């Protein structure tokens, strides 16, 4: 018995843990910012790209390395010298061999950069690339916020549509039952009954389609919120109870720079830094170096012998490099960087105009939806009352079926218009709030 109770408690706690209740679109946006897989992946990539700072800083720091070389001189250089220098006869020559066949050298080398302007420019380019990555994350967050707002309201819209369609189906069922009774009594013809029955079937099919759309929207919303398909997501808000704001004047358009524009601005700055870096390639570089080497030369492979000498070589100096001619490569790179800068500036101007147009379009859509909302709500209430009145009249025989059908179709049109209008109001209102940083 205790084991069954324990299992029940575990199952209950699992169900509670997997159920997510969202009461507002702001909660949905906060959850998406915390748990969206794409955002989390972008944050991890940002941390990985942070290591690029160390990679670009390395050429400006001292470098040290240990090295060892083994050479086998299978053909040593030979020089002819007069034999008289070696005690021979004048006019004769002796051949002298230079070096030994087996050479082993090992040592340490340290290099310290003194002047390297292109490498310092690379640091600025790396920092700018990291800023671009941050701006790309802001663009991704903005896109996910917009998608979340649209899917959140689409889910509420389809849920409301299901509720209204269920009421329509209930009225169609009642009408079909009345028509069936009249058909059995011979009051109406089979044609009228079949038409009523067809409306009932069509309404049932619309209900199934709305239920499918609701499930799809809910699953897509789970995906954006970082939930598994098996997790439970409950939206407790009712759009009809949320207060709608007033029209938004043009002066209240979002003043914050859109992330898309900021991203293009950072790309323009990157192009400027890259152009400057290509120009710095003309500057010379200066580095100091020191090298210490121990070398052994043998006639046989006996380097482990302690009786043979090792020779020490030490050197320190400065290396100055000034590129004079590179076959036109520097000029080509500078020209390419200039063209990339112009392309980035063009993209920035286009993106700024695009975002301004988009903001204006959202504002106009929202204002139009606000103006139409009250009219559509009144129209919906009137059409709902008309359906009830028409059903009573049809039941009492005062209305023909065609008259009732006209009223019913008008009610369907009013319902769809009201739901779409309500959804447009809150979707565009939420998007404007997101773009205002609220």
Map each language-model feature to its residues:
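Short segments within alpha-helical structural elements
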Residues: 58, 205-227, 380-438
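Bacterial Sec-pathway N-terminal export signals of envelope proteins
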Residues: 16-69, 75, 229, 235-274, ...
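Small/polar, glycine/serine/threonine/aspartate-rich low-complexity segments that form flexible
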Residues: 20, 67-108, 238-245, 290-322
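Sec/SRP-type N-terminal targeting helices
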Residues: 40-44, 57, 101, 114-141, ...
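Periplasmic alpha-helical coiled-coil/stalk elements that build and connect Gram-negative outer-membrane
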Residues: 27, 137, 141-255, 365, ...
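Outer-membrane beta-barrel pore domains and translocons
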Residues: 67-73, 111-113, 158, 168, ...
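Bacterial Sec-dependent N-terminal signal peptides
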Residues: 1-25, 425, 437
